[in-house]
Curated annotation (Swiss-Prot):
Gene3D superfamilies: Erythroid Transcription Factor GATA-1, subunit A, Retinoid X Receptor. GO terms for molecular function: DNA-binding transcription factor activity; sequence-specific DNA binding; zinc ion binding. Its main location: nucleus. GO terms for cellular component: nucleus. Orphan nuclear receptor. Coiled coil: none annotated. Belongs to the nuclear hormone receptor family. Residues 145-362 form the NR LBD domain. It is found in: Nucleus. This is Nuclear hormone receptor family member nhr-77. Pfam families: Hormone_recep, zf-C4. The keyword Nucleus applies.
């Protein structure tokens, strides 16, 4: 009798294959259970721009996701244990309550990922103009200049933050296996396992993460892992000048197709732009903080913007101090680096679909 391989059940809320269990009176996946618990315990009410009539995956709209938790999955608010004190309550929640004088926190609509893709080109153009202007500024007094060189939110100087990312790619080499050279799914799983643990460690030391709640930190870990497994592997693959044929006959065809996609897009871009270590460290940090594939809180968006601006200011200072580039050349170079994020967005989206198809944790 042939063995029937049972697929994971589909979560009725997010519609992803997952380990569905009973949580708060409804059968849902662990991620949706955590979302429901956090929403209820913090007394958050989300708003939907389509009056809770969004189609497709509910993960793209937190209001519709919560609505499905209650109406479709049958989850019950009264089964969630209320927080006894505000010790672990995110600061933005406490500030919102203080400003409004209301215990309920109303949060606005979350834009879908494809809207962010379509508006990103405009963002790049604005960034180029902004950094050209920044490069020309030289009239500020030394004290004010030093004051502006420190992020008040992250509590670290722009240069030190960039060094944090440089250290990651130059010193942390506990796993020399490269994803683009794997010969089997087993090797790939070994790499992702190591990088998942490393991502957890990096999240503990990353400036500003202490201001985020646990749900945001779990999302951030995925971005760190993605950047290590795919982006850094691509850069190392180029630097090592890999031209030796790899026996990939045992590799899953879907995984092989994605690896070839990475080589034909990101690898080609890297070979054209010729990043040095400092530029790549800056690019990697942007990839981590500009990826907004799943829903993120306002606090996380603030921290992400702070990382982006601080790293880019440090990169701009590096160009001004250690290269002969003028302000327009600096603006153009930073624009090229930023523009490359668009292909990384698509790459992350395709990777997410691949992991689901392969039944890998994501």
């Amino acid at each position: 009798m042939p063995i029937v391989e049972l697929a994971d059940p589909i979560c009725p809320v997010c519609e992803f294959p997952s380990n569905v269990e009973l949580h708060f009176g409804g059968l849902v996946c662990g991620a949706c259970a955590a979302f429901f618990r956090r929403t209820v315990s913090l007394n958050i009410r989300y708003l939907c721009e389509k009056n809770n009539q969004c189609k497709g995956m509910r993960k793209n709209c937190r209001a519709c996701r919560f609505d499905y938790c209650v109406k479709i999955a049958g989850m019950k608010r009264n089964l969630v244990k209320q927080r006894r004190n505000s010790t672990n309550t995110p600061m933005y929640i406490l500030n919102r309550r203080k400003d409004s004088g209301n215990e309920e926190v109303v949060r606005g609509m979350l834009k879908r990922m494809y809207l962010q893709f379509s508006s990103f080109s405009g963002f790049v153009t604005t960034t180029q103009s902004k950094w050209a202007h920044h490069s020309r500024k030289s009239s500020m007094s030394p004290n004010k200049e030093a004051e502006k060189d420190v992020s008040k939110i992250l509590k670290i100087s722009h240069g030190s933050l960039l060094k944090y990312y440089i250290y990651q790619i130059t010193h942390d080499k506990r796993n020399n296996m490269n994803t683009l050279n794997i010969k089997s799914v087993e090797e790939f799983l070994e790499i992702t396992s190591v990088q998942n643990k490393l991502a957890a460690e990096l999240c503990k030391t990353c400036p500003g993460v202490d201001l985020l709640d646990n749900e945001d930190i779990l999302i951030l870990r995925k971005y760190f892992q993605f950047s290590n497994v795919w982006i850094e592997s691509t850069w190392n693959y180029l630097r090592e000048n890999n031209s030796v044929p790899i026996d990939d006959s045992e590799l899953d065809l879907k995984l092989l197709k994605f690896i070839n996609q990475v080589k034909s897009t990101l690898l080609v871009s890297f070979s054209q732009l010729k990043f040095n270590t400092i530029e790549f460290a800056a690019f990697k940090s942007i990839c981590i903080w500009k990826l907004v594939y799943h829903e993120t809180s306002r606090a996380m968006k603030i921290i992400a913007q702070e990382h982006y601006e601080s790293v880019m200011k440090a990169l701009n200072d590096y160009y001004q101090t250690y290269t002969s580039m003028d302000s327009m050349q600096i603006a153009t170079r930073i624009g090229e680096i930023t523009l490359l994020i668009i292909s990384v967005f698509q790459m992350y989206h395709d990777m997410a679909k691949l992991y689901i198809q392969l039944g890998l944790p994501f």
